[in-house]
Structure formats: C-alpha cells, structure tokens
C-alpha cells in the first residue's frame, strides 16, 4: 500500500505544480463534470499556458460569371457544394479553368480574359467523340460487306450445281468475270500482221438466287396447300372411331402377306428408289452428285470386309499339314 500512496502523492505534487487542485484526482467514472473536466488530459491541457493551434478554415468564393461578362457577388447561389456538383463535375467536358454548376457555360457566352487557352482534356474528349462517330459509321459498311458475301456464296452454289448437272465433255459454261472461278485469259500472240480486237465478252447469265428464292416460295405454298387438302380429307375419317365388334368379327379372315425370303430364311429387302433431286435446289443437286461419286467406295469397303472375314485370324489354331498316301508309302519303303 505504501507504493500506491507514494504514487498518489507524486501525482498531487505534479498537479499542484501545474495549478490543478488535488480534488481533481477523483476517478473519471465517479465525477459528474463535463466539458474540460471529463478526462485528466483535458484538464491538464486547459490549465497549461499554451497558445492553441490555428484551425483550418475553407473559404468558398461566391463570385460567378454573369451573362453580361462581369463579376456579380450578389448572385443567389449556394455557397456549400452538394451532390449535384459532383454529378456536374463528372459530366464536365474538360475546361482549362474552374467554374461552378450554376454558372453560365463559357463556351456559348463570352469568355473572360485569361481563359482562352484550351486544355488537353478538351482535346481528348473531342477525339473520343470523333472515334464514336467513326464507329457508328462503320456499322452500315460492315452490314453491306456481309450482304455482298452472302450474295456471292449463293452465286457460287448455283454455279457448282450447274457444273455438276452439266454432261461430261469439253463444254465450258460461261462464268461471271468477277467470280474467282473464272479462268485466266491466254496471253496475246505476237504476229507481224495486225490483230483484230477481241470480241466483247458474252453477257453474264441471269442471277440464279432470285429464281431459287421464287421457286422455294412456290414450293412452300404448294406443300402448305397439299397439307390442308389431306387434313380436310382425313378429318371426317378420324372423327369416326371404329367399333370393336367389327374388328373382332373380321379377326378370323386375317391373311398374312407373303414375304420373299432368301435361301437362308432372311427376308429380302428391296432398295427404295429415290426420286430425282429438284433442279431448282443447288444444295440437293450437290448432295446427289456426291452420293453418286462415293457410292463405289462404299461398295469396295463392304466387299473387302467380306473377303477379310474368310481369312484366318491370328488367334485361330494352325492348320494341320496334309500328307498324301503315296509319300507315306515311299518313306516307309526307304526306311525298310
């Protein structure tokens, strides 16, 4: 306890030296004082003869540029910035000087002296806007290029279909000089006699995509009309359901259809005759030509599989060698 008493006496001496009454040593949580008496640090700080540090004070000017290019201090404007000023600063176009939200735009009105030099920010904003305009103008160009490529693809499909359906021979179909399929012209022969100018090129063939589009639309209309007719014919028959008595009555008279079978007993399947591809559809013509071209390869593969099955497998037992009777007799006579 002597140590605590010594500490209390030391604190009393220190407080008396600084001019603090010793009654202030009561704990803070027991005292009811407010303000400068709330803590020991506040009490020491208020009693010390120290000059307070000057506080920072922000001064917001109320000067704004009026329409008549003179400074008017009496303009009714808020002195404290708000959140609206933050949004206004974000939407700023980049000026070389500071202005307030309620000020008149200096670009439309007269600019005071000293603010005539543009900033780098304004130049960058203009460049960005110019880039956006260029990006918008390039979109229709890209659409035009895509449409041109689609037309060229349809033209190539039509040409491939005409080449496939044409009979084999030296006949060369006239092609469009603008297409990549056109063959290069031979070099002119140098002769001493004057050469007549070459004849004009033949006119290009009519565009195939238009005919294909018309034919496809006609086919779709015909199919829809045929579907409607079949539905109209089958409608009354579907509504009337057959009675079970009629079905059971004819059960004894059922006859099975005769099916042709091979010698092994398996039924013979006949190949279905496929109709001729539509001449107006280039994709169908190309598919039919490819099927004809690769049909012999499928036949060769199936024939090779059948022959391969007859060959001995590596896992089968080896064949026993056959020994004829005359060799046995000859060998027996030699040993005897």
From Swiss-Prot:
Query: Which cysteines in this chain are paired by disulphide bridges?
Result: none
- Per UniProt, the ranges with Basic residues bias are 325-336
Question: Which of UniProt's keywords are assigned here?
Answer: Coiled coil, Mitochondrion
Composition bias (Basic and acidic residues) maps to 297-309
Residue ranges annotated as coiled coil are 139-166
GO BP annotations listed? aerobic respiration; mitochondrial fission
Into which family does the record put it? Belongs to the MTFR1 family.
PANTHER family linked: MITOCHONDRIAL FISSION REGULATOR 2 (PTHR14215:SF2), PROTEIN OF UNKNOWN FUNCTION DUF729 (PTHR14215)
Provide the protein name. Answer: Mitochondrial fission regulator 2
Q: Which organism is it from?
A: Danio rerio (Zebrafish)
């Amino acid at each position: 306890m002597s140590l605590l008493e010594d500490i209390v006496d030391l604190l009393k001496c220190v407080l008396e030296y600084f001019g603090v009454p010793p009654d202030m040593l009561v704990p803070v949580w027991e005292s009811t004082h407010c303000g400068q008496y709330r803590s020991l640090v506040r009490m020491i700080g208020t009693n010390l003869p120290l000059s307070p540090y000057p506080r920072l004070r922000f001064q917001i000017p109320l000067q704004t540029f009026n329409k008549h290019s003179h400074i008017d201090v009496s303009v009714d404007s808020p002195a404290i910035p708000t959140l609206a000023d933050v949004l206004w600063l974000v939407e700023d176009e980049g000026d070389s000087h500071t202005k307030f939200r309620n000020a008149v735009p200096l670009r439309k009105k007269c600019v005071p002296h000293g603010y005539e030099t543009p900033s780098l920010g304004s130049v960058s904003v203009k460049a960005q806007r110019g880039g956006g305009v260029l990006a918008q103008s390039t979109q229709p160009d890209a659409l035009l290029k895509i449409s041109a490529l689609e037309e060229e693809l349809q033209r190539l499909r039509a040409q491939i279909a005409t080449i496939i359906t044409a009979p084999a021979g030296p006949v060369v179909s006239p092609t469009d000089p603008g297409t990549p399929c056109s063959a290069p012209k031979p070099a002119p022969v140098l002769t001493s006699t004057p050469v007549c100018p070459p004849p004009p090129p033949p006119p290009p063939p009519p565009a195939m995509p238009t005919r294909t589009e018309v034919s496809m639309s006609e086919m779709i209309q015909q199919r829809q009309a045929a579907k409607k007719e079949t539905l109209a014919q089958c409608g009354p028959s579907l509504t009337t359901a057959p009675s079970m008595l009629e079905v059971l009555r004819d059960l004894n008279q059922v006859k099975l259809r005769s099916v042709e079978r091979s010698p092994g007993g398996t039924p013979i399947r006949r190949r279905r005759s496929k109709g001729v591809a539509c001449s107006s559809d280039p994709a169908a013509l190309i598919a039919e030509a490819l099927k004809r071209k690769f049909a012999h390869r499928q036949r060769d593969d199936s024939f090779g599989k059948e022959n391969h099955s007859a060959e001995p497998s590596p896992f089968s037992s080896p064949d026993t060698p056959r020994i004829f009777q005359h060799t046995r007799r000859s060998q027996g006579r030699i040993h005897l």
